[in-house]
């Protein structure tokens, strides 16, 4: 869902949508779930004190550092991987389990990488666009990369399935809450907006924001990382 935030001004690789009819049906199903469950719950969570929400965001961002670091290595960026693993160690200890983002205060910038992006840097084409029930928009490439990224997630290796499920639900709730204030950006055909924004954001992430000049995108990237 966070991918809906990015403007349609970015250039991105060509991704076909041969399953549009099926994708639209799935999109309507997801919209129904969001309207009846996710959005009302996120609206309730929005009333929580900002420091609590900030701590939750930081903690879940911290859990993704291992996945990001591993993929940085696979993409041939060892120094960036060192930066990210350093963030994880510092924030997990001094930052009390990642609640406080000490790493950023020390000048260690946060990055986001997954195995789908790694496949892209290896030259694997995006493949067709697909909309999945509950999970939302994907390309075929990112769909194949998802199991590896899930395996590299810290929560995947938690032995208590109830705790694992609970953390994933809180993560989804936290992400949905951050979207409430930017829903006004949605315009025109919502399906096309979501699809195009998703593809453009993937391109932005794969290129690490290089050679892309878009102040709106920079602002939104800061919003997501904060």
Located regions from the model:
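Short N-terminal segments immediately surrounding and downstream of signal-peptide cleavage
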Residues: 14-28
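N-terminal signal peptide c-region/cleavage motif recognized by signal peptidases
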Residues: 6-12
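A glycine-rich, hydrophobic loop/mini-helix early in the fold
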Residues: 50-77
């Amino acid at each position: 869902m966070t991918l809906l935030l990015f403007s349609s001004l970015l250039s991105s690789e060509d991704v076909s949508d041969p399953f549009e009819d099926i994708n639209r049906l799935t999109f309507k199903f997801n919209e129904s779930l969001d309207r009846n469950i996710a959005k009302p719950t996120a609206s309730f969570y929005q009333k929580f004190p900002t420091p609590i929400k900030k701590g939750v965001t930081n903690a879940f961002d911290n859990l993704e550092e291992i996945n990001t670091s591993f993929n940085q290595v696979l993409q041939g960026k060892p120094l960036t991987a060192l930066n990210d693993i350093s963030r994880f160690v510092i924030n997990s200890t001094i930052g009390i389990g990642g609640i406080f983002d000490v790493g950023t205060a020390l000048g260690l910038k946060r990055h986001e990488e997954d195995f789908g992006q790694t496949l892209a840097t290896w030259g694997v084409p995006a493949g067709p666009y697909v909309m999945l029930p509950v999970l939302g928009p994907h390309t075929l490439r990112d769909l194949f990369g998802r199991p590896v990224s899930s395996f590299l997630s810290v929560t995947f290796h938690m032995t208590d399935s109830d705790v694992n499920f609970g953390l994933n639900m809180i993560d989804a709730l936290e992400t949905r809450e951050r979207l409430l204030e930017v829903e006004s950006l949605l315009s025109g055909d919502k399906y096309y907006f979501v699809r195009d924004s998703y593809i453009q954001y993937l391109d932005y992430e794969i290129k690490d924001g290089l050679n892309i000049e878009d102040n709106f995108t920079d602002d939104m990237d800061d919003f997501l990382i904060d």
